[in-house]
Amino acid sequence: TDTYNNFQTKNAPEIARLFEYLNYTVKDYHNGSTGCGLGSSGTGDDVKGLINFMRGSDYFDYDGDCNINEVRASVMGDVYHSQLVEVGRPDANLKYNEENEEAFFRAKNNYQNFYTNNFSRKSVIYAGSNSGVLHAISAEDGTELWGFIPPFVAGLLPQIINRNYNGKVDGNKGGSNPIFAVDGSPVVHDVFMKGIKPTGTIESSASWHTILIIPYGRGGPGFSVLDVTDPESPLHMFSIYNDNINNRVLVADHEGNITQKPYNSGFSSSLQSLQGVKALENYLEAREEDI
């Protein structure tokens, strides 16, 4: 749908702002005096060209034929450090011996019903690539269902542009810089929580969801979280990027809003967080009951 298919040239201004968050700018790769003499001076056409490149076009003229609107021979980037993970029907354990086990929590909160409702769920393979895309691939026939470019990985994409490659590789072929992007291995877990509805609103009560965590690995100190309960209608929950160059943490929420959290000086501990305080209270309460 158009709601999902949003990495397009019509959204170039919004996508270009993602570059600015990480202090990258697009270089003027194509203009009247370079390579094939295509494009115009300035970077407006190159921002759109980079977007089209991510969608499979040969904007950097890999084959040297000066046709930058054709689909290039190899579209998918390398899957290097990212391990593949397959997600099909829910399969978490429901057998428990003690009430402090995770299996007891699942049984108590009707995980069996979640299992039944998703028994026939499409089996999907998820893998991160260094072209900047998390790929969702049908385990049945190998076709790609969709691709997701995390917002803070999108901010890194101008790095692939190298004007020195314009017409100077192998005689007259173009090229681009290889980078690390979505280089970490996805992690999947079924979580009982108040999820996000397709409308963008938060559920009024908790339910089971299949959550996919996407670390960027060598692509940068960040990660994205998707709800893939319905693998054909994924939902972006949030993304976090630790920008240690500018001493801040960037957070993108489920509505696409990006906020900046500056580093605070001083000492902090997880025990001081709301979750840490609650965990300590639960521990002390359980200890008193044992005594």
Q: Which residues are covered by each model-predicted region?
A:
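A fold-level detector for beta-propeller and closely related beta-sheet-rich head/sensor domains
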Residues: 1-291
